[in-house]
Amino acid sequence: TEFIQANAPEVRSRWCTNEKTAMEAALGMSYAGKRSLVCMKHVGMNVAADAFVNSAITGVNGGLVVLAADDPSMHSSQNEQDSRFYGKFAMIPILEPSTQQEAYDMMPYAYALSEELKLPVLMRVVTRLAHSRAEIAVHEPLAQKPLSPDNERTHWVLLPGNARRQYATLVEKQGTLLSKSEESPYNSEFNNQNSK
């Protein structure tokens, strides 16, 4: 937070009581048309689950990226839970960078995907990536989006009639999500002929 405040004063950052309130705050900004990022550990996804899963049904207005830091081998956590299961359960796009450069480059891609599909995007990183650093090639930051609230309450209030309609929309988007995944520049296969 202090780094952001010192180096990017136009970006608003905040600490929240817990992961659920952080998810709700980010979702509220997204509903108002602003891009939002919410970060938490994998076990924090359990706390944020209600707001997270329902955000896939309401959809988003401004791009929303949920960054979850998983901890394979339990270096500093009580379990090895895999956040990708939450993304699959919520039926939203999941990105998984393997290097610091990929993590940096995927963020604008994640926002573009979120805004195009009107869905939150889950970005999963692991301990070795989250607790490391490297030089990266930087690019121009994304332009800020103005507040542009969508005041149609049926989009954001999940009463049963609205929820059924919104859920049907989410299900209809699954074919598009599959196509986007197959076309993604970050979804590639490497065949190392020299590996043993």
Region spans (language model):
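Thiamine diphosphate
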Residues: 1-100, 105-107, 126-129, 142, ...
